[in-house]
A protein has these predicted regions:
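Short, low-complexity N-terminal intrinsically disordered segments enriched in polar/charged residues
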Residues: 2-49, 144
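Short beta-strand edge/turn micro-motifs at domain boundaries
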Residues: 6, 116-141
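A solvent-exposed, acidic/Ser-Thr-rich amphipathic alpha-helical stretch
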Residues: 18, 22, 40-96, 103-105
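Short, surface-exposed coil-to-beta transition loops
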Residues: 83-86, 101, 113-120
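A short, structured loop/turn motif at beta-sheet edges
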Residues: 90-98, 124-129
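Beta-strand elements of well-folded, non-transmembrane domains
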Residues: 106-108, 123
Length: 144
């Protein structure tokens, strides 16, 4: 991970659901700061090689490289993501990590239209690092 070492507590040191929620909130911020700034290298450190990304509009993407390529081609400079305040839910997955559920908004620079969608993200803690293993992004539409 080099320059992108994680500062989020490991699953083995988290003692409460509140601590887990703080950790996953920090991970979500790291992930989408990289997404919003097109930091593909950082983004790549936060997802597993066999990532599965399910999207209601574009279908299934399997693998880190196809996912990062899609971000480069379709997202960089075209879309920014914002977590809807108060929407985040985090639940422990024993011996694995956590499930993150929430609502996010997507802004297109120079366009007043704002999209909104729901998401479920599985975070795995393995070998001293948190990484996204599965994502379901669904119910995309205009902001409600």
């Amino acid at each position: 991970m080099g320059a992108y070492a994680q500062t989020v507590p490991g699953l083995d040191t988290i003692k409460s659901e509140e601590e887990l929620t703080r950790a996953v909130t920090a991970l979500d911020k790291q992930l989408f700061d990289a997404y919003n700034t097109c930091n593909i290298e950082k983004l790549g450190t936060l997802v597993v090689d066999d990532l599965e990304f399910y999207h209601d509009k574009t279908g299934l993407t399997v693998g880190k490289k196809p996912f990062l390529d899609a971000i480069k081609m379709n997202i960089c400079g075209k879309v920014t993501r914002e977590l809807v305040p108060g929407s985040l839910e985090v639940y422990p997955l024993h011996g694995y990590g956590a499930v993150e559920i929430g609502v996010h908004r997507f802004h297109h620079p120079g366009d007043s239209d704002v999209g909104e969608a729901k998401f479920v993200t599985l975070w795995q803690y393995k070998d001293g690092a948190w990484k996204v293993t599965r994502v379901i992004s669904y119910d995309h539409g205009a902001m409600k």
